[in-house]
Amino acid sequence: MTDGAQPAAPNATNVLAALGLPAAALVQQRVPKKLLIDNGAITAGDKRVITDGIDEIHWLASLKPSTVGVPTFVDDGEPPVREYLEVAVLSRQLRAGAKEHRIAELVHRSIPYPLLLVLAQPGAMSLSVGHVRWAQNEAGKVILDGTPYEARIDSSTPAASVSALMQSLALTQLPRADLFVLVQGLIDALTGFRASLLTGPPNTPPTRERAAAQRLALQRCIDLDSQIAQLRGAAVKDKQLPRQVALNLEIKRLSAERADLIASLGD
């Protein structure tokens, strides 16, 4: 590596090492694409996304009571909404130009377990975690609950943030009361990483409550970025001075709100 060059993005091997799992939890099996197509693809377009975008699929590990010593989870609903018997860790090697975000969602839909997914492609890696629940209208079917929470790393990502993320993924650092709490801990780790891209690495890992507040602030920042971009585009096109002034004032107001949110993300 030359002076000043960014380190390469981590890969699935690095993530697995960071987790620090016991040998009993390792699976290391190849998964056929047909599993994703049969269980996750909704349209012909989704099938093409999987077929054209994914090179290799591997089931890296299975986290359950017998392999990592973390109890299962069943909520107290009648009937239960969630039952976590294990958490899967999968990796996907993507081809250049693959639709990364869509593939992540399709993979999470196709696996009937809460999932930590590693998507690797040349020069970049993304991690995503999603909760699951029982389907309300189809007995015995497990579905993705909401949108997977994602974080992306590439060669431009600050090394300190990547290092802090890898440390926060260690099984010994994650909450282990039950598998639901473990999954939420993984989501909180990704939240802390995304916040660190705006504020710098935290001095201490965020609490569950702090991570929840960070997720709300991060989503609001994304919404504000979109609004600001639209307003700037409108200001460039609008030739009327009063309208330009009004648009620029709104941009200034939203930018100030964004700055306050970023300040709130820090320790």
Model-derived features: positions:
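Extended, non-transmembrane interaction/recognition domains
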Residues: 82-216
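Alpha-helical oligomerization segments
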Residues: 205-208, 214, 218-267
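Weak global preference for isoleucine
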Residues: 37, 42, 50, 54-57, ...
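N-terminal, leucine/charged-rich tether regions that mediate assembly and partner docking
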Residues: 1-136
